[in-house]
C-alpha cells in the first residue's frame, strides 16, 4: 500500500498478511504509520496505490461500511464509545452480522460489562470502555479484528485482562492485527510481528524471535530503519 495525507507520503509499499486465528502485532515509534495502516485497511484513509485483499476480495476502494460487511471489526484508538448511552445501548449500535457473537455471549465474556449494563459510557473506567469497544466490534462477528492501542492509559491489571481477551480470539479463529506501544506484552501474545519506521516495514518475522532480542525491544521507541534492517 502507498497511502498519502494530501501531498504527504505516509505509507511506503507497506505489505502485511494476517491469517485466520493468528495474532499479528504492528509495532513502531509514534508517527511511524501504524494507525494509518489500520485506517487504510478499513477504508477510512484509502491507499492511493496498491491493494487491500480481504478474504479474496479487493477492498482498497470500498467505503468503511462495506469493509465491515466483509467481516472486519475496528477498535480505534481512544475507544470512541457513546458516552451518553448505556452499555446495553452501546451494544445495540453495530450492524450485527450473523454468527456466534450475540449480546448474551458478550456479557458472558465480559462480566464487568454485564454488571454495568445500565451505566452510561462516561461512567465506565478506561478498561471497561476498552472492553465495550472490543465487545461492539465482536458483535459484527468479524473474521479480522483491527485493534489500535487497546492498552493505552490502562492500569497493569486491566492491561492483562484486555490482553487475555485478545488471546481468546485465537481460539475463535479470528485474525487479529494489533497496533501497540506496549511492546513486551504484545509480543508475548502475538504469533508474528511487523515493525514500521517512517511508513516502511523494516522488520517482519516471528514475535518470539523479536522478543528475544533485548536490545531491539529496548530501542523500539526510537528505532531507525537502518537499525531494524540489521
Range-by-range predicted roles:
Residues 42:
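Helix-to-loop junction immediately C-terminal to a conserved catalytic motif
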Amino acid at each position: 500500500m502507498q497511502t498519502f495525507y494530501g501531498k504527504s507520503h505516509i505509507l511506503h509499499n507497506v505489505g502485511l498478511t494476517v491469517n485466520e486465528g493468528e495474532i499479528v502485532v504492528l509495532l513502531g515509534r509514534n508517527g511511524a504509520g501504524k494507525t494509518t495502516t489500520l485506517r487504510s485497511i478499513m477504508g477510512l484513509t484509502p491507499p492511493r496505490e496498491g491493494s487491500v485483499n480481504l478474504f479474496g476480495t479487493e477492498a482498497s476502494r470500498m467505503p468503511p461500511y462495506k469493509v465491515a460487511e466483509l467481516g472486519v471489526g475496528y477498535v480505534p484508538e481512544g475507544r470512541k464509545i457513546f458516552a451518553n448511552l448505556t452499555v446495553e445501548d452501546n451494544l445495540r449500535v453495530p450492524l450485527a452480522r450473523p454468527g456466534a457473537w450475540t449480546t448474551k455471549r458478550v456479557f458472558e465474556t465480559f462480566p464487568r460489562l454485564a454488571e454495568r449494563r445500565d451505566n452510561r459510557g462516561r461512567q465506565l473506567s478506561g478498561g471497561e470502555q476498552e472492553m465495550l469497544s472490543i465487545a461492539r466490534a465482536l458483535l459484527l462477528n468479524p473474521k479480522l479484528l483491527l485493534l489500535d492501542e487497546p492498552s493505552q492509559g490502562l492500569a497493569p491489571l486491566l492491561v492483562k485482562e484486555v490482553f487475555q481477551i485478545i488471546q481468546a480470539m485465537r481460539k475463535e479463529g479470528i485474525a487479529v492485527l494489533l497496533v501497540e506501544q506496549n511492546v513486551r506484552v504484545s509480543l508475548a501474545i502475538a504469533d508474528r510481528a511487523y515493525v514500521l519506521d517512517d511508513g516502511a516495514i523494516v522488520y517482519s518475522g516471528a514475535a518470539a524471535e523479536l522478543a528475544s532480542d533485548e536490545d531491539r525491544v529496548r530501542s523500539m521507541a526510537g528505532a531507525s530503519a537502518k537499525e531494524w534492517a540489521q
